[in-house]
């Protein structure tokens, strides 16, 4: 998905997945909807979805790898004059207090806030890490002042989804 928000070009990779058949063996309405996605290329759309964790074990690195992705659920066409926006609402329990990230010049370039989410069965958990721009450090101070580890919290904000590769030297 490509959009212009506040004069800045943004590109979002959104994954769509569903089974072709329901548990009852009937054709899935979501599958029917997703099969029409190629017809929407080049058109303005509205997507509802979720930020999801993808966790897997890397035998090459001999460690657990966690990535976040945007998972689309519902998509519909909108008028071409609609203003581009990208917002999110995400909630969960605070896994750890906000972490300050610094670059090689020892400048703060972001704060990380990690939320945990349990599945409905209660036998699995996902972790979502939100990055807060240092220009909005008041958000971090509010989290530190009002919430403790394990408390339920909800964030609403503007979505900037970047792929980042971290190399440990």
Task: Indicate residue ranges for each PLM-predicted region.
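OB-fold and OB-like single-stranded nucleic-acid-recognition modules
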Residues: 1-169
């Amino acid at each position: 998905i490509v959009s212009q928000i506040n004069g800045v070009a943004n590109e979002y990779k959104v994954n769509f997945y569903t089974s072709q058949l329901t548990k009852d063996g009937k054709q899935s309405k979501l599958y029917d909807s997703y099969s029409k996605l190629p017809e929407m290329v080049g058109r303005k759309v509205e997507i509802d979805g979720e930020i999801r964790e993808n966790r897997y074990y890397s035998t090459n690195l001999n460690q657990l790898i966690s990535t976040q992705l945007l998972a689309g659920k519902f998509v519909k066409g909108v008028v071409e004059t609609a203003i581009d926006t990208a917002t999110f609402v995400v909630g969960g329990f605070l896994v750890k207090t906000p972490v300050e990230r610094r670059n090689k010049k020892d400048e703060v370039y972001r704060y990380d806030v990690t939320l945990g989410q349990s599945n409905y069965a209660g036998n699995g958990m996902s972790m979502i890490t939100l990055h807060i721009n240092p220009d909005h450090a008041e958000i971090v101070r509010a989290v530190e002042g009002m919430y403790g580890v394990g408390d339920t919290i909800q964030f609403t904000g503007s979505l900037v989804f970047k792929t980042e590769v971290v190399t440990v030297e």
